[in-house]
Regions:
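Nucleotide-activated donor-binding/catalytic signature segment of Leloir-type glycosyltransferases, i.e.
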Residues: 221-263, 267
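Donor nucleotide-sugar binding/catalytic pocket of nucleotide-sugar-dependent glycosyltransferases
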Residues: 117-167, 407
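Conserved donor-binding/catalytic core segment of Leloir-type glycosyltransferases
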Residues: 5, 172-190, 196-199, 210-212
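Extended catalytic core of nucleotide-activated donor transferases of GT-like folds
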Residues: 5-7, 45-128
């Protein structure tokens, strides 16, 4: 059995936290292969989950095991941004959501080269890494600096699995019968201000709603107060509007989140995101059967298209969402994050007219959009089934740390133990 250290923000209420928990579940699916240890990290200012679920109990057991462990583990899986990865085990796999822009930083590419293998959550993230090429500051060939670049075999893509969650009714007071939904943090990347403002402008004189599950930094009362006032400013130019914007703020468990996707009055998920490494809320909405309106760029397009075979026998992809036109433009200055979102990177800027038209199309032709969403839901339930995702992790781990390597290591350890016994 291999000793495996899972390092990442596994207790945080964040995308990376959910990513770490997804990897934890994959490891748990093979107790015959993996002896799991957990080292939790923080993720920004996001809160930690301390509930007493069965999963959290197992996580805390693995944390306690880690605190008592001495020596070097066989393998580490590090669910973190690349510049936080370290070589702490015999073999090390870096796992990241990747990048939401069209360019990975030189620092990230170097860290990817310095670790044994990389796993990302989308083909978008993989392609961005492969296309981000720099000059190596150390390696020279024929008097020229060599390219610092990743090769396809150094990166694998493993997305999130579909979850089978119950729907916990929260008793929401939604007065409008037809409502859109968006889930986002109110920062530069999600472009939440445009989502809210353009919705309100399109449905100013109609009895239509938008449910916004959001925060700015955390789930505190102060955060809610600040976000509420910020959102009021986004729509203050629309005096006398009939449409409603509902703010949902605070901690929700997974059953409550899935209740939003399955609420009888919530009809469609919408976003004007600049870019996604994967887009977990979009994915959850899609596999819950909600129609989706989104720009057709970055990580979420992986799961919003259905794989099909054309009449000529060639593979193709069928879009099962309502596309929003966009332009790739340089990231805003307030979005630049050293060694993460670089100044020269670009991401998508949704077209206002196209977004409003997409909302209107869903509203007036809902039956056809719902049928399209049902087709996508059925595809994802098979394509992204939990068992398949778990198998992919096992396959990649075996590639990086083959079973025969482990068996030899274990055999040598047994010989050493026997020698000590005879001494």
């Amino acid at each position: 059995m291999r000793t495996v250290l899972l390092k990442g923000p596994i207790l945080s209420r964040s995308g990376y936290g959910e990513h770490a928990r997804s990897v934890f579940r994959a490891l748990q699916s093979r107790p015959d292969l993996y002896d799991i240890y957990v080292e939790p990290t923080i993720w920004g200012k996001t809160p930690w989950s301390h509930n007493v679920s069965d999963e959290n109990k197992e996580i805390f057991k693995c944390i306690n095991k880690r605190m008592q462990f001495q020596g070097t583990m066989n393998l580490s899986l590090q669910v973190m941004i690349p510049n936080e990865w370290t070589n702490i085990a015999e073999k090390n796999i870096g796992i990241t959501a990747g990048i939401e822009t069209d360019l990975a930083s030189e620092t990230w590419v170097q860290f990817c080269k310095d670790i044994d293998h990389v796993i990302v959550v989308s083909n978008h993230a993989k392609n961005v890494f492969l296309n981000s090429v720099y000059k190596d500051k150390v390696k020279v060939a024929n008097g020229q600096l060599m390219d610092l670049r990743l090769e396809p075999e150094e990166i694998d893509v493993i997305g999130y699995p579909v979850k089978n969650k119950e729907s916990e009714d929260m008793g929401l007071d939604i007065q409008t019968d037809f409502n859109f939904l968006t889930v986002a943090q109110a920062g530069p990347r999600k472009c939440l201000d445009a989502t809210v403002r353009w919705f309100a402008e399109e449905f100013k004189d109609e009895n239509v709603g938008l449910v916004v599950k959001a925060n700015m930094q955390n789930n505190s009362k102060a955060d809610r107060y600040n976000l509420k006032n910020t959102m009021k400013n986004w729509v203050k130019h629309l005096e006398g509007r009939k449409c409603k914007v509902y703010l949902l703020h605070g901690n929700l468990n997974e059953d409550q989140i899935h209740h939003l996707y399955n609420h009888e009055k919530i009809k469609c998920y919408i976003t004007t995101t600049h870019g996604e490494g994967f887009g977990l809320p979009i994915f959850e909405a899609a596999y819950s059967g909600l129609p989706v309106v989104a720009p057709a760029w970055s990580g979420h397009v992986d799961f919003l298209y259905k794989k099909i075979i054309k009449k000529n026998g060639k593979p193709d992809r069928k879009p099962l969402f309502t596309k929003v036109k966009y332009e790739l433009e340089k990231v805003q200055k307030n979005a630049v994050w050293e060694n993460v979102i670089v100044e020269d990177a670009k991401w998508a800027f949704s077209d206002q007219k196209s977004f409003k038209k997409a909302l209107r199309n869903v509203y007036v032709a809902y039956a056809s959009k719902k049928a399209m969403a049902k087709e996508l839901k059925e595809f994802l339930e098979v394509e992204m089934a939990e068992e398949k995702i778990h198998e992919k992790y096992v396959e990649v781990i075996n590639k990086v740390y083959p079973p025969e390597v482990f068996e030899v290591t274990e055999w040598l350890q047994q010989i050493e133990n026997n020698l000590e016994t005879h001494d």
